[in-house]
Every structure is written in structure tokens, then in C-alpha cells.
């Protein structure tokens, strides 16, 4: 549940329409989601072996520190706090708030609701990993019910959308098609993002060498099935043209199948989904800031552990404060545009770290990624192709993200010197 809850947020309910704006046949739309799932699955295999080799607090932070240099790990934690994790959480919190207000019509702003959600989940996760994971498991079960209802309702629409092209491709094989597929992969992989954060809590699992790889693999495969099913019913009911012209495809599918009550039901489901994503982020990522403090490259107080709950309470609160500030600032849309480029640079570098660990220690008694080095190289190459595509599509926003990433290098050495 922890892995699936970290992936299934608001993206699958919105991003199919973004994909349909880039590629225009059912084959390409579904194919992009399947390919994105393969990238996520390859990444899960890589991270599963890394977690088995390095079951430490901080997950990806520890892998980068041990494979390369503490500066590389610091830059990862720096961008996690300032861009990728908190920025994504702020945007999802506002998405939650908007759907919440659509249901309740409460006389408050979406920013206030978003801030309240972030604060409440910060408090819950300060109670410890067990309390946080119980909330996460409950929300994931509710999400599965909502998604099952969406898929079931979509399949019940007996008459598919008219004028659906039977062609596999919407244009000849060319650089234009490649760039369109690359652009479509950006929202797909953003929707698949989150599986890697489960490795942050590896040190807190009773048997992480056995349990974490299994959780990653089963979780990612489950999400692929969910995402492809949801995308299929969107194409089945709306058709590629209808899909690309609605920014709320899940509501459109439910409205076609069950009328306004159906659309309202799925709005509640999306609200639950986004709340679950926020719960997962609050539960996992603060372990990275804790690990940075333990290494002496961040405020020592961030390493404080609550004596009763054993949770890194200061780290959790810090992340919640930063995410709340971003949510209240209203600049979350811009941050989302460059989250992907920064995220996948670090994913690719982390994939390279497995090649380094395999070279240093060829033998390992724990989990070993099947198909290595081909699986690992597929993941690494895919990551950097996504980065190149994102920079090409969103050069200005990518430049902002890369600037923040690179700024972490002098900050690290300043921190070490001081």
C-alpha cells in the first residue's frame, strides 16, 4: 500500500488529457502509459537492489552519498526540499483543496484549505511511521474503490466514442513523432513518480532486504494496471478528440456513464487520492533531511527524534512549512513544470550508482535486479531522454530547476566550511 499510495495521486485523473494533446491515437495514448510503466518498473528494480544493499535512513540520499560524494547527496536533498518534493506536494494540496471546495462549497480560499491539509498531515506523521502508514493504507483502499468505480462505469458505456481512428500512428515516423512521444511521457512519468520514496524508510522496516523489493515490484505493477485501465476507459468513452478537449477526463467519463451524481462521486475520489499522496510524502521524504542532519550538512535540530513516537518530528515540520509556503504563494504551477527535469536527472544518476556498487561489490546476498546491466541501462538512458525532452519542451522552467539544483553545490561546501 505504501508504494501504490506514493504513486497514485491526482495525475492519473488529469494527465490522460495532457497526453492526448500530444499524441492522438488510442495506440499511442495507451502505449505511452505502458512505456512509462516499464520505465517505472525498471526503476523499481534498480531501487529495490539499492535498498537491499543500503537499507539506510534517507534511501536515495544514502545511495548517492556512498556511490559518489556527499556533495551529490546534499544536492539531491537540497532539491527535494526546495523543488521536487515540496513543490509537488504544494501543487497536489491545492488540487485537493479545489476538489474539496467543489464538493463542500466552503467559504474559504483553496490556499487556506491546502495549508490546513499540509498542517494536519504533518501532525499525523509526527506521531510515528505506524500511525502515518495506517492513514496511508486506509486512504489507498478508498482510492482503489474510487478507481474501480471509474473503470467499471467507463466499461458500462456500451457505445464507444464515434470516429475513433484505427490508425496506430497519427503521423509518419519522424523526429516530430519522437518529440511528441517525449512530450507525452513528461506528464506520464510525473504521474508514475513516487515509487522511489518508499526506500527512504528502509531503515525503519523490520526486514527491509526482503520486504522492500517485494513492495516496490508489486506496487509498481499494480499501478501500471490501474493507470492503463483508467486511460483505456477514458479513450473508450471520450475518444482521443474528446479526451484532449477536457481537463477533467475522470469527471467526463463518470458524467457520461452515471450523470452528475457520478461526476460528484469521482470528485470525492480524487479528493481522497490527493490526500493520500500528501500523506505518503509527509511520511517518507523527511527521512532524507534527517539523514543530511546526521551527516552534518544540515541543521542539527532536524535530526531530533521524538522520544515517544521515534519520528523525525523537526524534519517533518520543516517540510510541511516549506510546502505550505509554496502552496500559499500561488507559484506551484511554475514549479511543477521543472520538477520533472530535476527529478529525472537525479533518477538517472542514482541508476548509475547501482553500476558503481555492482563494480565495487559484485557479490550480494540480497535482492539483485533481474536483467542487470540491461535493466539498469534502460532506466538510466530513459531518464536522460526524458530530461532532454523536458528541456526542449519547457526551456525556461527547466533552466530555473537546473539553477536551483546547481546552486546546491556551493551551498554544500559553504555549509561544510562553516
PLM segments and residue spans:
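C-terminal membrane-solvent junction of multi-pass transporters and transport-like membrane proteins
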Residues: 301-313, 347-397
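A generic transmembrane alpha-helix motif of multi-pass inner-membrane proteins
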Residues: 158, 338, 342-343, 371-418
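Transmembrane helix-loop junctions in multi-pass membrane proteins
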Residues: 12-18, 93, 124-130, 160, ...
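Hydrophobic transmembrane alpha-helices that form the core helical bundles
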Residues: 18-20, 40-118, 122-126, 131, ...
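Hydrophobic alpha-helical segments of multi-pass membrane transport proteins
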Residues: 147-150, 289, 339-365, 382, ...
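TM-loop-TM module centered on a large, flexible mid-protein loop between adjacent transmembrane helices
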Residues: 62-63, 69, 102-106, 172, ...
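Helix-loop-helix junctions that connect adjacent transmembrane segments
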Residues: 26, 30, 107-109, 138-268, ...
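Membrane-interface "cap" regions at the ends of multi-pass membrane proteins
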Residues: 1-27, 40-45, 56-57, 68, ...
Amino acid at each position: 500500500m505504501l508504494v501504490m499510495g506514493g504513486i497514485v495521486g491526482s495525475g492519473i485523473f488529469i494527465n490522460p488529457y495532457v497526453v492526448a494533446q500530444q499524441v492522438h491515437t488510442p495506440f499511442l495514448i495507451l502505449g505511452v502509459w505502458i512505456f512509462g510503466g516499464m520505465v517505472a518498473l525498471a526503476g523499481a528494480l534498480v531501487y529495490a537492489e539499492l535498498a537491499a544493499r543500503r537499507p539506510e535512513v534517507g534511501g536515495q540520499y544514502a545511495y548517492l552519498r556512498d556511490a559518489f560524494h556527499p556533495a551529490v547527496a546534499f544536492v539531491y536533498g537540497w532539491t527535494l526540499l526546495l523543488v521536487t518534493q515540496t513543490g509537488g506536494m504544494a501543487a497536489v494540496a491545492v488540487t485537493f483543496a479545489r476538489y474539496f471546495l467543489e464538493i463542500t462549497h466552503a467559504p474559504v480560499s483553496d490556499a487556506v484549505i491546502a495549508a490546513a491539509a499540509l498542517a494536519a498531515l504533518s501532525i499525523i506523521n509526527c506521531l510515528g511511521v505506524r500511525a502515518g502508514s495506517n492513514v496511508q493504507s486506509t486512504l489507498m483502499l478508498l482510492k482503489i474503490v474510487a478507481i474501480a468505480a471509474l473503470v467499471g462505469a467507463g466499461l458500462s458505456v456500451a457505445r464507444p466514442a464515434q470516429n475513433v481512428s484505427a490508425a496506430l500512428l497519427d503521423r509518419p515516423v519522424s523526429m516530430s513523432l519522437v518529440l511528441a512521444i517525449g512530450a507525452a511521457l513528461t506528464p506520464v512519468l510525473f504521474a508514475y513518480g513516487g515509487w522511489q520514496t518508499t526506500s527512504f524508510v528502509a531503515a525503519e522496516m523490520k526486514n527491509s532486504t526482503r520486504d522492500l523489493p517485494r513492495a516496490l515490484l508489486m506496487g509498481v505493477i499494480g499501478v501500471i494496471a490501474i493507470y492503463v485501465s483508467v486511460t483505456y476507459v477514458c479513450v473508450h468513452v471520450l475518444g482521443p478528440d474528446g479526451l484532449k478537449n477536457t481537463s477533467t477526463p475522470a469527471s467526463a467519463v463518470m458524467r457520461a456513464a452515471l450523470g452528475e451524481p457520478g461526476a460528484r462521486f469521482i470528485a470525492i475520489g480524487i479528493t481522497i487520492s490527493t490526500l493520500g499522496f500528501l500523506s505518503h510524502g509527509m511520511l517518507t521524504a523527511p527521512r532524507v533531511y534527517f539523514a543530511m542532519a546526521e551527516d552534518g550538512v544540515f541543521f542539527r535540530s532536524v535530526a531530533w527524534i521524538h522520544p515517544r513516537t521515534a519520528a523525525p518530528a523537526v524534519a517533518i515540520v520543516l517540510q510541511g512549512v516549506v510546502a505550505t509556503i509554496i502552496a500559499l504563494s500561488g507559484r506551484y504551477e511554475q514549479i511543477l513544470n521543472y520538477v520533472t527535469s530535476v527529478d529525472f536527472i537525479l533518477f538517472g544518476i542514482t541508476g548509475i550508482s547501482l553500476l558503481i556498487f555492482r563494480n565495487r561489490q559484485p557479490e550480494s546476498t540480497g535482492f539483485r535486479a533481474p536483467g542487470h546491466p540491461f535493466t539498469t541501462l534502460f532506466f538510466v538512458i530513459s531518464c536522460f531522454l526524458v530530461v532532454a525532452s523536458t528541456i526542449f519542451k519547457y526551456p525556461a522552467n527547466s533552466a530555473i530547476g537546473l539553477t536551483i539544483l546547481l546552486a546546491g553545490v556551493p551551498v554544500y561546501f559553504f555549509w561544510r566550511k562553516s
